[in-house]
């Protein structure tokens, strides 16, 4: 079971998952069940590259940094609690300079599941039985 949090998130569309496999709707449906998902100006087919994708192997470090900073400016504009992504490389790239907590979708769902657990109360603490010691 999951718990819907009052926290907010934006979703970064990873290049391969989105443009490569046309998966845009499903990650948002999942996130909407557990956080308040905010829209960003460039998402889905218009989503921004993280700056470190496999398609950017021809770019130098400065170019990759500029792409990352541009994407983070868009994603952090409305001060969400989380930037969510479904790509470990995008997460690793954004964590370098994000002011917002960057998490994989699975981490956000897991946190929601942890928050939905009912507390367990221990009515009685049983002491362990003393073991008999046999001397030889």
PLM feature spans:
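Iron-sulfur cluster-binding electron-transfer modules in prokaryotic oxidoreductases
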Residues: 1-136
């Amino acid at each position: 079971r999951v718990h819907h949090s009052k926290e907010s998130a934006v979703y970064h569309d990873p290049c391969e998952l989105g443009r490569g496999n046309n998966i845009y709707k499903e990650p948002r449906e999942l996130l909407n069940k557990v956080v308040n998902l905010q829209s960003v100006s460039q998402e889905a087919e218009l989503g921004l590259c993280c700056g470190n994708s496999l398609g950017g192997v021809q770019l130098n470090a400065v170019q990759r940094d500029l792409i990352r900073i541009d994407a983070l400016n868009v994603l952090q504009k409305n001060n969400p609690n989380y930037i969510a992504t479904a790509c470990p490389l995008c997460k690793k790239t954004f964590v370098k300079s994000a002011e917002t907590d960057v998490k994989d979708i699975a981490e956000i769902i897991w946190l929601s599941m942890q928050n939905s657990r009912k507390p367990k109360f221990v009515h009685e603490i049983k002491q362990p039985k003393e073991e008999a010691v046999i001397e030889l």
